[in-house]
Curated annotation (Swiss-Prot):
Its cofactor is [4Fe-4S] cluster; [3Fe-4S] cluster. It comes from Rhodobacter capsulatus (strain ATCC BAA-309 / NBRC 16581 / SB1003). Ferredoxins are iron-sulfur proteins that transfer electrons in a wide variety of metabolic reactions. InterPro entries: 4Fe4S_Fe-S-bd (IPR017896), 4Fe4S_Fe_S_CS (IPR017900), 7Fe_ferredoxin (IPR000813), Fd_C (IPR022569), FdxA (IPR054829), RnfB_subfamily (IPR050294). Keywords: 3Fe-4S, 4Fe-4S, Electron transport, Iron, Iron-sulfur, Metal-binding, Repeat, Transport. The lineage of its organism: Bacteria, Pseudomonadati, Pseudomonadota, Alphaproteobacteria, Rhodobacterales. GO terms for molecular function: 3 iron, 4 sulfur cluster binding; 4 iron, 4 sulfur cluster binding; electron transfer activity; metal ion binding. [4Fe-4S] cluster binds at residues 21, 40, 43, 46. [3Fe-4S] cluster binds at residues 9, 17, 50. The keyword Isomerase does not apply. It holds the Pfam family Fer4. This is Ferredoxin-2.
Length: 112
């Protein structure tokens, strides 16, 4: 099992989760984070840290797409281990559905 970052992180990008990860498996895009599913050790410490409830176990129904999404972008984006401020309008987007289709950017973030 692994954990994956899902839709609600997009356009919010809280980074509370990255500082608690013992294996540094979070990667930063321009407006979201992802977890490298092959590096995640399934410890679960990141899940309760996410204010947007965007981190889910891959065993939940419908997570297959998110596993591949996370794997794809983790191989392209820089690692992030230090907490940063969320996106400027994060409160506006938190909880909105369909954010991947509306707002996702494939551009990398800056990393640490």
């Amino acid at each position: 099992m692994t954990y994956v970052v899902t839709d609600n992180c997009i356009a919010c990008k809280y980074t509370d989760c990255v500082e608690v990860c013992p294996v540094d498996c979070f990667y930063e895009g321009e407006n979201t984070l992802v977890i490298h599913p092959d590096e995640c050790i399934d410890c679960g410490v990141c899940e309760p840290e996410c204010p947007a409830d965007a981190i889910r176990p891959d065993t939940e129904p419908g997570m297959e797409d998110w596993v591949e999404f996370n794997r794809t972008y983790a191989s392209q984006w820089p690692v992030i281990t230090i907490k940063k401020d969320p996106m400027p309008d994060h409160k506006k987007y938190d909880g909105e559905t369909g954010k991947r289709e509306k707002y996702f950017s494939p551009n990398p973030g800056t990393g640490d």
